[in-house]
Amino acid sequence: MKKHRVVVGLSGGVDSAVTAHLLKQQGHEVVGIFMKNWEDDDDSEFCSSRQDFLDAASVADVIGIEIEHVNFAAEYKDRVFAEFLREYQAGRTPNPDVLCNAEIKFKAFLDHAMRLGAEKIATGHYARVRQNPATGLFELLKGLDPSKDQSYFLHRLNQAQLSKTLFPVGELHKTEVRRIAADIGLPNAKKKDSTGICFIGERPFREFLNRYIQHAPGPILDDRGRKLGRHVGLSFYTLGQRQGLGIGGVKEKGAGAKAPSGQPVRGAGDHAPWFVARKELETNTLRVVQGHEHPWLLSHRLDAQDASWIAGHPPAAGACAAKTRYRQQDAACTVLAAQGDAFNLQFPEAQWAVTPGQSAVLYDGEVCLGGGVIAAVNG
């Protein structure tokens, strides 16, 4: 194996720590970088970047590598957070982690690493990279641990980025990663995995969003136009949402609910839960339906835009598989058309709560082909 100078993104978590250890064990020259992507609020009790850096520094000390603290907060605000706010203001539900990977971790961080003389970068993502011997193209593969696979969040990476990237823990299961961390005495071996959006931390999402987006309360209507309550602002809701609707105690209003066809809704009735089905920006109305299988929650087709293809070109029309949300099982689909930065997918089985703003990511078996942002859905 050729030895490289590798710059590892050390987050303070166990996955990136084991990544650095494995690479050093393989004989590479390893340097760690801690990326600060969000400026802590002066009085915030939620942001943990200071502690994360201390954890990363402790890891670097145990492994025996240098670590540098680099601030990418300005780049993050311009390239990721601004788009995040625009999408919410437009009534969509964005996925900032996808954009963060493409613009910060594999662009700003990669550029910085190259200036340091790195030949490769590495992160603790659960994914794999290989070079196809027939085409010479680099491919992004799912991580071997299906419960931790993060290829969905990496689908916007291009050939140049993948050619410089290593994902050592993508070849392992999470249990193996924690075992390795414990065996070599890493101080963060039992550290809890990070969850949620990095710049929000553990604070309530509604509280955070309320600081940046103007909102207007409005009516909550069911599929027959009956008023069930008031929402606090459309930006605070997403399709398929069940919790936090504030319409408990109105179960009798859904009894006998029917689909637009006039047929009773399966699962609707006195005790069926309510779900967000539509956000009508023109009238500032939140539409909810009762029952998990309500037709308004199901769709067979989606249109996507702002597509990015790992091979540099869209896949041919035909059979494929796709995810429309993280941790979803691959769903069989047909690529109806894929031209430029737009594509259309048709699903033989109805998909539940497909959400504009989220990513539709295509797969050919274990190979991630790329994807785009869901723009519209159709029944």
From Swiss-Prot:
Q: Name one GO biological process term.
A: tRNA wobble position uridine thiolation
Chief location bin: cytoplasm
Which family does the record assign?
Answer: Belongs to the MnmA/TRMU family.
* Name listed for the protein in its UniProt record: tRNA-specific 2-thiouridylase MnmA
Q: In which compartments does the protein localize? A: Cytoplasm
Which InterPro entries does the UniProt record give?
MnmA-like (IPR004506), MnmA-like_C (IPR046885), MnmA-like_central (IPR046884), MnmA-like_central_sf (IPR023382), Rossmann-like_a/b/a_fold (IPR014729)
- Give the highest taxon in the source lineage: Bacteria
Q: Which cysteines are joined by disulfide bonds?
A: 100-198
Q: Which GO terms describe its cellular component?
A: cytoplasm
E.C. designation(s): 2.8.1.13
What the protein does comes down to: Catalyzes the 2-thiolation of uridine at the wobble position (U34) of tRNA, leading to the formation of s(2)U34.
What is annotated as the active site? 100 (nucleophile), 198 (cysteine persulfide intermediate)
